[in-house]
Amino acid sequence: MTRYDDLPYRTCVGMMLINERGLVFVGRRAGVEQVDDSYVWQMPQGGVDPGEDTWLAAKRELYEETSVRSIEKLAEIPDWLTYDIPRVVAGRAWKGRYRGQRQKWYAVRFIGEDNEINIANPGDGHKPEFTAWRWEPMQNLTGLIIPFKRPVYERVVKEFASLAGAQAGT
């Protein structure tokens, strides 16, 4: 059996979807990563297929989780951000193959209407990742995410903070 510290990171992407008011999409997560029901909200994220471009993966994942296609790319964090999942969860999450995620993050402007968002029947027939969704001020995101992902969200918010004000016209 592979030791936790020797497990690799799963390569993933994350998307900060910002509306015209400068608010950010968050979804109420349904899944095995939940270790505390207090922190069940997150931004869309998901795995990168072997050989897949990260920007294309991010657009695909956003569509598969929200049905959203009406976006404009605003920014990208050049670094890969990582987090470790708790050891108690590691044996169940991703069938015990990974210790956490290595993520490339993008910020995008949502240029569609809210009725484009469909988490109940997401794009390409994928299983729903979220049970509810809402628009949230960017500064609130770190308090909504599960604690082991919080350092990544702190960095994402710091990197993209200027985009919320620009979107809101402030």
Curated annotation (Swiss-Prot):
GO biological process, one term: ribose phosphate metabolic process
Residue positions of motif Nudix box: 46-67
Coiled coil: none
Keyword Hydrolase: yes
Function, in words: Accelerates the degradation of transcripts by removing pyrophosphate from the 5'-end of triphosphorylated RNA, leading to a more labile monophosphorylated state that can stimulate subsequent ribonuclease cleavage.
Family label: Belongs to the Nudix hydrolase family. RppH subfamily.
Protein name: RNA pyrophosphohydrolase
Organism annotation: Nitrobacter winogradskyi (strain ATCC 25391 / DSM 10237 / CIP 104748 / NCIMB 11846 / Nb-255)
